[in-house]
Amino acid sequence: EPEKRIKQYPFELSGGMRQRVMIAMALACEPDILIADEPTTALDVTIQAQILELMQDLQKKLGMAVILVTHDLGVIADMCDNIIVMYGGRICERGTAREIFYNPKHEYTKGLLRSIPNVNNMKKKLVPIAGTPINMLNLPAGCAFCTRCDAAMKICLTEHPDELTINENHKAACWVNIRDRLMAEGGEGNV
């Protein structure tokens, strides 16, 4: 009923309908890239699935790329081919969805994955990420995650690590990986 909807105010629409309106506005000029920032926040599971299906259909129909910004790992697993994990405004890890979910290399990514409920083992205790989120106004010189990281070393506090290539589809910026690579190459692993 577009004739009816065009005359309505946002507060008169459901959350799902507001999301559809936002998607329609974003796609009106047929962009090459759609940036969807938390497109399913505050939507119930049924409407969430409809919105995600709509986005996938439009992506295929219009041949556009979609950059999906979300904290919902379930949505990421269903929707994404490639993933960039960020913490404190910096990229921690990037790779294919398969690499990130089955072979995480950054301690933050590992922590996120440990905190997902396992439907096959509901008795398994969830492991929260220790500490409190970083103050974005007071970032450390080193890795932003270091104060919450069980594997942190002294260098993590003072120097931000370069991205290390794990394989052609996977990179991570973590001193632990750099140390492990040095040790695997016959060094002492001093970083």
What do these predicted regions represent?
Residues 94-191:
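Short catalytic/signature loops enriched in Gly
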Residues 30-31, 35-39, 43-124:
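P-loop NTP-binding/switch modules centered on Walker-like glycine-rich loops
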Residues 1-4, 120:
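Conserved "ABC signature" C-loop
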Residues 4-9, 124:
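Interfacial catalytic loop of ABC nucleotide-binding domains
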Residues 9-13, 17:
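Conserved ABC ATPase signature
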Residues 17-19, 47:
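Residue-level micro-sites within transmembrane alpha helices that shape
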Residues 22, 65-67, 142-144, 148:
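ABC nucleotide-binding domain signature
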